[in-house]
Amino acid sequence: MSVGTVYGKIGSPRVLFCVSVAAVAGVEVEHVDVQPHNFPADLAAKFPLQKMPVFVGKDGFPLSETLAIAFYLASLNKTRALNGTTAEEKAKVLQYCSFTNSELPGAFRPIIAPRVFGAPYDEQAAKEAETAIALIFARFDEELASKTYLVGSRLTLADIFFTCFLKFGATYVLTKSYLAKYTHIYRYYQTIYHQAKLDAITEPLKFIDQPLPIIKAENKEAAPAKKAEKKKDEKKKNAPKPQAERPAKPPKHPLASAPNGSFDIEEYKRVYSNQDTRSGALPWFFEHFDPENYSVWKVDYSYPEDLKQPVFMTNNLIGGFFQRLEASRKYIFGCCVVIGENGDNTITGAFVIKGHDYVPAFDVAPDWGSYTFTKLDINKPEDKAFIEDAWAWDKPIEGREVADGKVCK
């Protein structure tokens, strides 16, 4: 009988870790694939921050945070000590799990996100990430030289979690030849992969020969029209020379042809800039909003677990995203804010856009795939309150203080 349900994307090493722990412990759980910050209403009511993974027991017991879920599921099997047996082993298991959870996501992100999610590629950040991974692997390789498992003489949560991140890296960037340089990790990965039942949960063990290519932003500009071929016709030689061809104009923005409606988004930008947000700009917006030709969207960063960084760095992430939205600026207005604190924060916000399809408004930014978009209804009190708070910045959002933010106008 199932003890509950794990919610989250199985492609996430953190979600895979929780599902794997249950499988190894012999504890039956269900898995439901959900996107971060796009939980169903009943699940969002239990977990307002909407970060994955989360767990709900059959009796309704709610639990969030990767390590808490994994340790709970492991503890349900009293005969298999996946948490460790002695006090010292339990402490070491927690040490390795904590290290994996805090260090590996940030190390992998600069080299995986541009290949999987289309995030901008930062060469300097990628080099620093590669150096960090090499240091981490060197440390683990040295430790594994004289032992089969990280802690004790049996499989523990420490092994399962580290191997889930090894699989994450080996799926996209860590080639067979790269892993083979770390002889003991290479052997360890193949051993633990099967013991952690990853072959049954996801796919058989395999290696890649080349990292996935970096996703390049599409070139939106039309190529110049080809010159007509010259014909060997004497009359053509005597014909008047045509004027030099001009490059074809770039295609219009997809939203340019959408109905303008009665809402003047440029006027609202001026109102927002010149009037108090609560007493002036927000009442103006709700009075003039045209729901037939415009829509409002909640924007959330899809990988908040990776933002273990200072607030200013997360705010810079918003700034870069907004810069890359330049081609859509005439058709959108919005704010994104950093909620939380240094070392534990995320991005959320609200945008009004022309039309009802968010894709053409945001896909001009190569990193738009790193965000989740949820349509809002201004007639719902909770949605209206979120828009107000996201644009006013003067109240906590989702239970967290607004630390900083930026306006796209």
Swiss-Prot record:
General function of this protein: Probably plays a role in anchoring the complex to other cellular components.
Name of the protein in its database record: Elongation factor 1-gamma
Gene3D superfamilies tied to this protein: 1.20.1050.10, Glutaredoxin, Translation elongation factor EF1B, gamma chain, conserved domain
Gene: tef3
Domain GST N-terminal: 2-81
GO BP, one annotated term: cytoplasmic translational elongation
Top-rank taxon, per record: Eukaryota
Renumbered residue ranges of the record's region Disordered: 219-261
Domain GST C-terminal stretches: 86-212
MF annotations from Gene Ontology: translation elongation factor activity
PANTHER family, per database record: ELONGATION FACTOR 1-GAMMA
Naturally occurring in which organism (per UniProt): Schizosaccharomyces pombe (strain 972 / ATCC 24843)
Keywords assigned: Elongation factor, Protein biosynthesis
Subunit structure: EF-1 is composed of four subunits: alpha, beta, delta, and gamma.
InterPro entries linked to this entry: EF-GSTs (IPR050802), EF1B_G_C (IPR001662), EF1B_G_C_sf (IPR036433), Glutathione-S-Trfase_C-like (IPR010987), Glutathione-S-Trfase_C_sf (IPR036282), Glutathione_S-Trfase (IPR040079), Glutathione_S-Trfase_N (IPR004045), GST_C (IPR004046)
Keyword Protein biosynthesis among UniProt keywords: yes
Residue ranges of domain EF-1-gamma C-terminal in the record: 251-409
